[in-house]
A protein has these predicted regions:
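G-domain G4 guanine-recognition motif of GTPases
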Residues: 48, 117-118, 142-159, 180-196, ...
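P-loop NTPase switch module centered on the Walker A-proximal segment
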Residues: 5-97, 109
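C-terminal effector modules of nucleic-acid-centric enzymes and ribosome-associated factors
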Residues: 3, 9, 18, 150-153, ...
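Residue-level "contact hotspot" at macromolecular interaction interfaces
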Residues: 21, 66, 105, 247, ...
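Alpha-helical scaffold elements adjacent to nucleotide-binding pockets in ATP/GTP-utilizing enzyme cores
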Residues: 29-33, 44-47, 101, 125-132, ...
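Conserved catalytic-core segments of large NTP-driven translation/proteostasis enzymes
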Residues: 166-324
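Conserved Switch II/interswitch segment of TRAFAC-class P-loop GTPases
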Residues: 85-87, 92-97, 107-130, 137-159
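Residue-level signature of catalytic and energy-coupling elements of molecular machines
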Residues: 23, 29, 48, 70, ...
Length: 404
C-alpha cells in the first residue's frame, strides 16, 4: 500500500520559484498554496489569523523588514509535500532592486511561476523576470494571471495577457508557457478549480506542479564529478564531493580534467555504504584504479561521450548582483563548482559596465584552465560566480556559453 509520503517520493522532488512585479501577489499565492494543500502547521495558521481573515502572505514574508514594508526582500524557501510530490519552493522579490535575489531563487529551479496582475498586464519587471528565467534555462515556465476577481473573471483579459506574455517568451527562446488564470486571495485555480471561470479548462496551479515532468534526473546527462576533498586512507586516495550530473558506475573509464589523465572507477561509497553506481545529487567518495595526482577543483568525467571544455576563455550571460559596477579590465575571482581561479573581465557586450541587476554578456580570461560545460547542456557545471578578490563578495552570477 502506498502512503502519501512514499507516493511523493516516487514522483520526485520539484524545485520551483515564484517571481513577478511588486504587489502582484506572489507571497499570497504561495500562502494559498500552502494553506489549501494542508501544508500549514496549526500554530502558523493561528498566528496569521489573529486579526480575522488569514493574511496568507505572512506564511512566507518572514523578515521583519518585509512585514513592516509589506514586501518580500530576501528569498524565502518553503518545503512541503502533497500525496503526489515533494516541493522546494523559493518565493523571490518583485522589486527591481532585488532582481539579484530572483536570480538566486531561480538558479536551481526546474519551474518558475511568474505572476502578473490582471489589471496591469505585462510590465517591465514581468519581462525582466521572464528574461532571467530564459537566461537560466528554467525548464518549465508558468504564467499566473492573478487578481482575476478584480477584473470580473473576464476571459478576454486573461487571453490578452497570456498572448502578450507568450509572444515575448517565444522571442526569448522559451519553448512553452503554461498560462493559468487565478485569484490567490480568493483561492481560484490555486489548489481547487474556480467556480467563477468555467471558460478555463486547464489545470490548477497545484495540479500542474504535481504532474509536470522533472527533467533534472535525465539519464542521458553526462556524469560530472567535481572533487571537493582528497582523503588519504590505508595508502589509497579517495575523492569526495557531490555528483553534479549523470551517473557514475564502478568500472567506468574516466578522465581527470584539466590534466587529461585517465583511469577507471575502482570503488564508490555513498553515505558509508559501498555501491555499484552513484547518481546526480548524491554525496560520494570514489577510488580510482590508478594513483593519480588529483586535487580539489579537478573534475572527473567519463572518457566516452561528450567531454567538458577545458579553457581559459569564458563567455557567458550574466546578471550583475553587486552595488558596485562590473567594468572592463576589472580583476575578479571566478568560482566554478569547487574551483576558484583569478580572472579578468576582457569585454562586456554593448556596454562598458554593468550595474546592479543588469543583464548582459561577458568575456573572461582566467589565470588557469577551467573545466566548464555549456549551461544550456549541464546547468551544474555551466554556472559560475564572479567574486571580489579583496573580500570574496559575490559580484555576478554567470551562465557559460560555449561555441557551437
Amino acid at each position: 500500500m502506498s502512503t502519501p509520503m512514499s507516493s511523493a517520493t516516487e514522483a520526485g522532488t520539484l524545485r520551483l520559484a515564484t517571481a513577478g512585479s511588486v504587489d502582484d501577489g506572489k507571497s499570497t499565492l504561495v500562502g494559498r498554496l500552502l494553506h489549501d494543500s494542508k501544508s500549514v502547521l496549526a500554530d502558523q495558521l493561528e498566528s496569521i489569523s489573529r486579526t480575522g481573515t488569514p493574511d496568507l502572505a505572512l506564511l512566507t514574508d518572514g523578515l521583519r523588514a518585509e512585514r513592516e514594508q509589506g514586501i518580500t526582500i530576501d528569498v524565502a524557501y518553503r518545503y512541503f509535500a502533497t500525496p503526489r510530490r515533494r516541493f522546494i519552493l523559493a518565493d523571490t522579490p518583485g522589486h527591481v532592486q532585488y532582481t539579484r535575489n530572483m536570480v538566486t531563487g531561480a538558479s536551481t529551479a526546474e519551474l518558475t511561476i511568474i505572476l502578473v496582475d490582471a489589471r496591469n498586464g505585462v510590465v517591465e519587471q514581468t519581462r525582466r523576470h521572464a528574461a532571467i528565467a530564459a537566461l537560466l534555462r528554467v525548464p518549465h515556465l508558468v504564467l499566473a494571471v492573478n487578481k482575476m476577481d478584480l477584473v470580473g473573471y473576464e476571459e478576454a483579459v486573461f487571453a490578452a495577457t497570456a498572448e502578450e506574455f507568450t509572444a515575448y517568451a517565444t522571442e526569448l527562446g522559451v519553448p512553452r508557457v503554461t498560462a493559468i488564470p487565478v485569484s490567490a486571495l480568493a483561492g481560484d485555480n490555486i489548489v481547487d478549480p474556480s467556480a467563477h471561470m468555467d471558460w478555463y479548462g486547464g489545470p490548477t496551479v497545484l495540479e500542474h506542479l504535481e504532474t509536470v515532468p522533472v527533467a533534472a534526473a535525465a539519464p542521458d546527462t553526462p556524469a560530472r564529478f567535481p572533487v571537493q576533498y582528497v582523503i588519504r586512507h590505508d595508502e589509497s586516495r579517495y575523492y569526495a564531493g557531490q555528483l553534479a550530473s549523470g551517473t557514475l558506475r564502478v568500472g567506468d573509464p574516466i578522465t581527470v580534467h584539466p590534466s587529461g589523465r585517465t583511469s577507471t572507477i575502482a570503488a564508490l561509497d555513498v553515505l558509508g555504504t559501498a555501491v555499484d553506481a552513484a547518481r546526480a545529487g548524491e554525496s560520494l567518495t570514489a577510488r580510482l584504479a590508478d594513483e593519480l595526482d588529483v586535487a580539489r577543483g579537478d573534475l572527473l568525467a567519463p572518457s566516452t561521450g561528450p567531454a567538458p571544455s577545458v579553457t581559459r576563455d569564458i563567455r557567458g550571460a550574466v546578471c550583475h548582483l553587486a552595488d558596485e559596477p562590473l567594468v572592463v579590465g576589472q580583476r575578479v575571482l571566478l568560482r566554478h563548482t569547487t574551483r576558484t581561479v583569478k580572472a579578468i573581465v576582457r569585454s562586456l557586450a554593448d556596454a562598458d559596465r554593468l550595474t546592479a541587476n543588469d543583464l548582459g554578456h561577458v568575456v573572461l580570461r582566467t589565470a588557469e584552465p577551467v573545466v566548464v560545460d555549456d549551461y544550456a547542456e549541464i546547468r551544474w557545471t555551466g554556472a559560475f560566480l564572479l567574486l571580489d578578490p579583496a573580500d570574496g563578495t559575490t559580484l555576478t552570477a554567470g551562465m557559460a556559453e560555449l561555441p557551437r
